[in-house]
């Protein structure tokens, strides 16, 4: 068994995906070097009151050279939507077989200002 990890920041905060609609995703989680991340839970909260937001997840670590080669939206490994003022919960059953080699980057289908995007919590196992 590997390490159980999540993406809660040292300050208790979670990343919000807002304007990431071009070539650089929002970093949601960075793997420990040399380990892969197997998500078992993703909780996404849409803070906007009117817009369905589609999340596009890619396998990338934006801070390490060579680990961001697959950061483009066209390299999506998983997609899901979140209704306005709603929460999408994806469990181990939904995420079965999904593995991130470098980390999780996320794009938003629409450009939103801070406070109107999608906040994403991820938990899983690194091994």
Model feature map: region roles:
Residues 49-74:
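Short, surface-exposed beta-strand/strand-loop-strand elements in extracellular ectodomains
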Residues 35-41, 99:
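Short, solvent-exposed loop/turn segments enriched in Ser/Thr/Gly
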Residues 40, 51-56, 115-120:
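Short beta-strand/loop motifs in extracellular/secreted proteins, especially
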Residues 85-103:
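Beta-sandwich interaction modules
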Residues 77-81:
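Beta-strand-rich interaction surfaces with strong enrichment in secreted/lumenal proteins
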Residues 24-27, 76, 89-92:
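Short structured motifs
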Residues 1-34, 47, 101, 108-127:
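C-terminal interaction-tip segments
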